[in-house]
Amino acid sequence: MAPTLVSNAIASPTGKAVTLDPVRPNLGVDIAYQKKLDALIARMAAAMNRAILAVYRANPPELAQDESSPAALRAAMNSLGREWAKRFDDFAEHDAKRFVRSATGSADRAFAASLKKAGFTVEFKMGKAASEIITAAVAENVALIKSIPEQYLTQVEGVVMRGVAVGRDLGSVATELQAQFGVTKRRAALIARDQNNKATAAITRARQLEVGSAEAEWVHSAGGRKPRPTHVANNNKKYKIAEGWLDPATDKRIWPGTEINCRCVSRTIIKGLK
């Protein structure tokens, strides 16, 4: 007997509920995005290091006694900061939408495949709900990408000014700058991974509701080094898709993949036809 399809609402014709395979974020999407971010961050860090070290070499440790030297360092950093803020702005405007569409498109294909495996054929379209999700995801991603150079400059300026104040040598400053580069790269990796998780979770939830699914099973992901105990305890438990699950740790309703660095996903439950 063929599955029932009313508008986009579907039901199992056997009378028994069907649990679909979970939709997971496409790892390739965030890896590709992270590589682009890494390359941009590396160029920014290299430019900043060259400018800072050039001023530092021209004013060795005694520069702490010369007020013009800290001013020259700050001017060099601020000038480069403005330049790289513009470059990250351009990157965000051009690449954020492409990234979100890749993440949500991959999720749609994975969900359609899980439905097809269970015997259902559904073609997803770009309706109002999906369009709003993509718009919101792009806006959040743009804001996060634009924050990268601002946060980097703040941290680098702190490293350099502290170095000037205590008369650190060039080697010490260079070591700290390299460490800050690593911090910024790790933050970019988190942004790529977390935004992929969130976009996948949001579009999947919209599609679940679109096909008439009311419940899903929480699937804890063991990918993180510090799993949330409440998420672990909620593994395989059902929740209402429209309402989300009330996490006792935060006393708020959430969905898989929506909390920062949460890699949990869900199994969609297709109700049985009465």
Predicted regions and their residues:
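N-terminal leader/targeting and assembly helices and adjacent pre-domain segments
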Residues: 1-182, 270-274
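Acidic, glycine-rich two-metal-ion catalytic cores of nucleic acid-processing enzymes
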Residues: 182-274
